[in-house]
Curated annotation (Swiss-Prot):
S-adenosyl-L-methionine binds at G168, E169, S200, S222, L223, H224, N301. Its cofactor is [4Fe-4S] cluster. It comes from the Bacteria. The keyword Glycoprotein does not apply. It is found in: Cytoplasm. Residues 100-339 form the Radical SAM core domain. It comes from Aliivibrio fischeri (strain MJ11). One of its GO terms (cellular component) is cytoplasm. This is Dual-specificity RNA methyltransferase RlmN. The active site is at E94 (proton acceptor), C344 (s-methylcysteine intermediate). It catalyses: adenosine(2503) in 23S rRNA + 2 reduced [2Fe-2S]-[ferredoxin] + 2 S-adenosyl-L-methionine = 2-methyladenosine(2503) in 23S rRNA + 5'-deoxyadenosine + L-methionine + 2 oxidized [2Fe-2S]-[ferredoxin] + S-adenosyl-L-homocysteine; adenosine(37) in tRNA + 2 reduced [2Fe-2S]-[ferredoxin] + 2 S-adenosyl-L-methionine = 2-methyladenosine(37) in tRNA + 5'-deoxyadenosine + L-methionine + 2 oxidized [2Fe-2S]-[ferredoxin] + S-adenosyl-L-homocysteine. GO terms for molecular function: 4 iron, 4 sulfur cluster binding; metal ion binding; rRNA (adenine(2503)-C2-)-methyltransferase activity; rRNA binding; tRNA (adenine(37)-C2)-methyltransferase activity; tRNA binding. Binds 1 [4Fe-4S] cluster. The cluster is coordinated with 3 cysteines and an exchangeable S-adenosyl-L-methionine.
Length: 372
């Protein structure tokens, strides 16, 4: 029986040094050399690591591998946005590349599917399958950098910002999220500034409290409603941790953080005639008066089967102006990639649907026809 090789992308620097010492009998600086090859040069071939002696390279080839998710499908938008379905094991997750001048943001997934059942989210329709490993989280960045082109080839960083806003709830995968964030920030890893790495949460207070004082990155919170009654209707997690508990944990985190510069980004998806009238805007302004915040309004991205609609431009504009009357900094998220499957999780949902239909065909069974 062949022993599975150890994927070195699963280790942060501390873990990699321990592995080299305890399993390979090597000094810490050797681990550092290999880490630099993996992340600075996008190298997954031990034989190319020309400052590593041959004996160690042979050890590494026998026991280890550097294996990132691979692209199973890609959609390219006319505005430069790329949405990838990345294969993790026998499943897919979504990773989205969003270029904007000198800035290039990568939206990264943390889970296969999601357990939170937010009513407006395409990913929620797929249910929850499993947490991603460290290698599957950082591997999305590694693979995207390879797809876009390494810094040494293009003269510029392929990715300047990472947002943990893809499929899944990051704070329900704390065991793998923390070392993945460490790799993103590490000078031998992706060497990103802590202000250029953002974790978004729908309100997992226990996870946010674990992060407090342990890892310092930018924080974004998915609020989406100004009252517990409405939030519980569209985000069932609110029944576990209500708005007051959530915002209290947010204040604790930003008080311990330098990356957030004293305030949090509040994400608020605008659903037509659900959470987007002027009373909602005023309630939101009052709700956040004790929580220093900038507010990012997100016009809803429709997806097949969704019961919600995007508000009119006039409703979006009125909502924004009402908040600005309370002296909040308010932005409206720019629509990107609207000529491809724009809603988070939609591409993978399509991949899953096609896979199921192919299996049914192969089994010779009838294929159900969707009615409109």
């Amino acid at each position: 029986m062949t022993t599975a090789k150890i994927n070195l992308l699963d280790f942060d620097r501390k873990g990699l040094r321990a592995f080299f010492s305890e399993e390979l009998g090597e000094k810490a600086f050797r681990a550092d050399q290999v880490m630099k090859w993996m992340y600075h040069f996008g190298c997954d071939d031990f034989d190319q690591m020309n400052n590593i002696n041959k004996k160690l390279r042979e050890k590494l080839k026998n026991k280890c591998e550097i294996r990132a998710p691979y692209v199973s499908e890609a959609q390219h938008s006319s505005d430069g946005t790329i949405k990838w379905a990345m294969k993790v094991g026998d499943q897919d997750v979504e990773t989205v590349y969003i270029p904007d001048g000198d800035r290039a943001t990568l939206c990264v997934s943390s889970q296969v599917g999601c357990a939170l059942e937010c009513k407006f989210c395409s990913t929620a329709q797929q249910g929850f399958n499993r947490n991603l490993k460290v290698s599957e989280i950082v591997g999305q960045i590694w693979r995207a950098a390879r797809e876009i082109g390494l810094e040494k080839e293009t003269g510029r960083r392929p990715i300047t910002n990472v947002v943990m806003m893809g499929m899944g709830e990051p704070l329900l995968n704390m065991k793998n999220l923390i070392p993945a964030l460490e790799i993103m920030l590490d000078d031998l890893g992706f060497a990103l500034s802590k202000r250029r790495v953002t974790v978004s949460t729908s309100g997992v207070v226990s996870g946010l409290d674990q992060m407090t004082g342990k890892i310092d990155v930018a924080l974004a919170i998915s609020l989406h409603a100004p009252t517990d009654e409405l939030r519980s209707q569209i985000m069932p997690i609110n029944d576990r941790w209500d708005i007051d508990a959530f915002l209290a944990s947010v204040r604790r985190y930003i008080a311990s953080s330098n990356a957030n510069r004293g305030r949090v980004t509040v994400e608020y998806v605008l659903l037509d005639h659900v959470n987007d009238d002027m009373d909602h805007a005023r309630q939101l302004a009052e709700l956040l008066k004790d929580t220093p915040a900038k507010i990012n309004l997100i016009p809803f991205n429709p997806y097949p089967g969704s019961p919600y609609k995007k508000p009119s431009n006039s409703r979006i504009d009125r909502f924004m102006k009402t908040l600005m009357e309370y002296d909040y900094t308010v932005t409206i998220r720019k629509t990107r990639g609207d000529d491809i499957d724009a809603a988070c999780g939609q591409l993978v949902g399509d991949v899953i649907d096609r896979t199921k239909r192919t299996k049914v065909k192969q089994q010779g069974e009838a294929i159900p026809v969707k009615t409109v």
